Amino acid sequence: MHSFNKDIGSLGEDIAKNYLNQIGYTVLERNFRCKVGEIDIIGKDGDYICFIEVKSRYGKLYGNPCESVNYPKRLKIYKAANIYMLRKKLFKFNFRFDVIEIIFNTYNDVPSIKLIKDAFQI
């Protein structure tokens, strides 16, 4: 990944974390990594443990950011989520997979933020 893309991704994750805190999520962990993949943000929303993929883009030239969360990516997130839940012994919790789209624009410094709850299931 190019440095510019990493910077956009990191900025998007910072914005997403702040947004989630504002709407009542509790952020439990960021950038959870294991042998099968990575989860950008793990949070708690009510009774749910949420595994959140953050997708950041400048504009929609290549479609909506959430469209890049394809089946292979979903499967990696799912496998990483299972490992996280086993390690933390979170068997009794409900869980779901959310996606946050962050779209930066050239007109102002205010990005568009869209949270898609229960964005996919495996």
Swiss-Prot record:
InterPro entries, per database record: Restrct_endonuc-II-like, tRNA_endonuc-like_dom_sf, UPF0102_YraN-like
Disulfide bonds: none
Family matches, as Pfam families: UPF0102 (PF02021)
Gene3D superfamilies: 3.40.1350.10
Record-level Gene Ontology MF annotations: nucleic acid binding
Family, per entry: Belongs to the UPF0102 family.
Stated name of the protein: UPF0102 protein CKL_1410
